[in-house]
Curated annotation (Swiss-Prot):
Pathway: Amino-acid biosynthesis; L-histidine biosynthesis; L-histidine from 5-phospho-alpha-D-ribose 1-diphosphate: step 4/9. The gene is hisA. It comes from Ralstonia nicotianae (strain ATCC BAA-1114 / GMI1000) (Ralstonia solanacearum). Disulfide bonds: none annotated. Pfam families: His_biosynth. Keywords: Amino-acid biosynthesis, Cytoplasm, Histidine biosynthesis, Isomerase. It comes from the Bacteria. The active site is at 8 (proton acceptor), 131 (proton donor). Belongs to the HisA/HisF family. One of its GO terms (biological process) is L-tryptophan biosynthetic process. It is an enzyme of class 5 (isomerase). Its EC number is 5.3.1.16. This is 1-(5-phosphoribosyl)-5-[(5-phosphoribosylamino)methylideneamino] imidazole-4-carboxamide isomerase. GO terms for cellular component: cytoplasm. It is found in: Cytoplasm.
């Protein structure tokens, strides 16, 4: 089970939001590259970056911070980025700059043809981000709710060659209420694409639940507020997951 620290970027700073609300941002660091180094030193094997400003405006906005993170740790572990990625040129530029994976969210929902083109051009590097509230997919920085069911969209993407799906339960994001295991497993069982859980991780108990369903196709989890607030020690959590995986 891969535990992936999240670094959410707003105005060049590392922040955490509650339920995607930009007005409820807590600043955890003004040096995102140093934060990236911290997580690598704590044993992270991949990093998850989100350009929050970019997600809302539809184009990259925290480029300096992202490039600084890639320069700091990109040669050591894979780095993935989501937020504001809506065209092939942006994907190519980020991959050339050293990102390992690019996450397509809103654009995948609104323009499936773009996602298909991206998977064809950059096979093995494209992750889809499906963000949902009560089972319905949300777009545009979670500000717009669609009528699409998560599982229906995921099945559609299966033939495109998507590397994995990050499934976020918006209602639990930043709330430390625990992962929505049932919805995550339902999605993982419905498709052959590996699923990464996101939203609500709060304790080693969540890690236990996730490791128990790893064989269903849940390959990892994004770690957010809990590792910043101190509710969860990242190194301890990854070690715990490794021991369960080896058992």
């Amino acid at each position: 089970m891969l535990l992936i620290p999240a670094i959410d970027l707003k105005d060049g700073q590392c922040v955490r939001l509650k339920q995607g609300d930009m007005d409820q941002a807590t600043v955890f660091s003004e040096d995102p590259a140093a934060m990236a180094r911290h997580w690598v030193d704590q044993g992270a094997r991949r990093l998850h970056l989100v350009d929050l400003n970019g997600a809302f405006v539809g184009k990259p906005r925290n480029e300096a911070a992202i490039k600084a993170i890639i320069a700091e740790v990109g040669s050591e572990i894979p780095v993935q980025l989501g937020g504001g990625i809506r065209d092939l040129n942006t994907i190519e530029r980020w991959l050339d700059d050293g990102l390992s994976y690019v996450i397509i969210g809103t654009a995948a929902v609104k323009n499936p043809g773009f996602l298909q083109d991206a998977c064809t051009a950059f096979g093995g590097h494209i992750i889809v981000g499906l963000d949902a509230r009560d089972g319905k997919v949300a777009t545009d920085g979670w500000s717009k709710l669609t009528g699409h069911e998560v599982v229906d969209l995921a099945r559609k993407y299966e033939d495109y060659g998507v590397e994995s799906i990050i499934y976020t339960d918006i209602g639990r994001d930043g709330m430390l209420q625990g992962i929505n295991i049932d919805a995550t497993v339902k999605l993982a069982q419905s498709v052959s694409i590996p699923v990464i859980a996101s939203g609500g991780l709060s304790s080693l108990k969540d890690i236990d639940h996730l490791c128990a369903v790893e064989s269903e196709g849940v390959e990892g989890v994004i770690c957010g507020r809990a590792i910043y607030s101190g509710d969860l020690n990242f190194r301890e959590a990854q070690d715990h997951a490794d021991k369960l995986g080896a058992a």
